[in-house]
């Protein structure tokens, strides 16, 4: 007959295995997202709401910051969640949130890459200001659009890869500690 301790350890090992599988599945999904950043994903709807809220949040800081605030807030919000989990000592949850951060950066890179051609549909229609066209024009960096978009995409991809490794390592580490 198994003791209560043996049963609990078995459940903990199962939980760790589930965590590894979840990290792997998230990794496959988000690595696919990194390879296809132009595709729309469900999480992009969340990112869009956060992006638009960022314009309102940064509005008191002037026009440039209000416009930059959309993309900034879209990246800051997942960072806040990641920081919260890290502060609480939950590295695995932090790793999962880093997948979101990486995908959000990919989303921002697509918007930045569109700053010259301006073909993405904007919420306000044709009369809307294209955030990245406005920002890069004001910073005299429109000629650097491709480089800037690539750098943001690379950072997003690296964040996703880091999240994958960190999530698996933390799940595996907790599995070893439970045996």
Predicted regions and their residues:
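Metalloprotease/metallohydrolase-associated module, dominated by Zn2+-dependent proteases
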Residues: 4-36, 63-179
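Active-site alpha-helix of zinc metalloproteases
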Residues: 43-48, 66
